[in-house]
C-alpha cells in the first residue's frame, strides 16, 4: 500500500500523576506508506516550561491509556512483530520521533524501511532523548492513541 495509513490527533493523555510539561498539550501524528517503507510526522503543541529540552517519542505496540504507561507495551519493533528472537533495536526497526521544544512546540519526522501493521497503537512521549544504543528514553510522560 502507498499513501496515508493513519492520521491521529487530539489531547495527549497524561501518564504521570504529577504535573508535567505535557499537561493540556495536543499532538498530531501521520504515518504515510511509500514504496520503500513509511514516513511518520509528529507535531506537539501546548508544551509548558520545557523550551530547549529534547524528549524521546516512539510508536508503541499497545494502546494509549491515561495513567497507565505500561498499557502501551514496548516500542513497535518490526523485528519483534516478525517474531525475531534477537531483534535489532535501532531507528531502522523502530519509529523514533525525538523532538526539541521551541516556543512550546516540537516536530519530529522518521522514515523507516517498513510499514507498521495496523492495530491499537500509541505514540508515547518520554522524559529523555532516545539513547541510540539501547533505544531507552526514560519515564513515560504522555501518549496519543493511534489506531488503524
Question: How would you label these PLM feature ranges?
Answer:
Residues 1-148:
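N-terminal leader/targeting pre-sequences
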Amino acid at each position: 500500500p502507498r499513501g496515508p495509513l493513519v492520521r491521529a490527533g487530539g489531547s495527549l493523555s497524561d501518564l504521570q500523576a504529577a504535573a508535567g510539561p505535557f499537561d493540556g498539550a495536543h499532538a498530531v501524528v501521520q504515518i504515510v506508506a511509500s514504496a520503500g517503507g513509511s514516513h511518520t510526522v509528529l507535531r506537539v503543541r501546548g508544551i509548558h516550561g520545557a523550551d530547549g529540552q529534547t524528549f524521546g517519542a516512539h510508536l508503541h505496540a499497545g494502546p494509549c491509556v491515561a495513567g497507565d504507561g505500561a498499557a502501551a507495551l514496548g516500542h513497535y519493533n518490526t523485528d519483534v512483530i516478525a517474531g525475531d528472537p534477537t531483534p535489532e533495536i535501532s531507528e531502522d526497526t523502530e519509529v523514533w520521533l525525538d523532538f526539541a521544544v521551541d516556543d512550546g512546540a516540537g516536530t519530529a519526522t522518521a522514515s523507516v524501511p517498513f510499514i507498521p501493521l495496523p492495530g491499537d497503537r500509541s505514540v508515547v512521549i518520554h522524559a529523555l532523548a532516545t539513547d541510540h544504543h539501547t533505544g531507552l528514553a526514560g519515564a513515560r510522560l504522555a501518549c496519543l492513541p493511534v489506531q488503524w
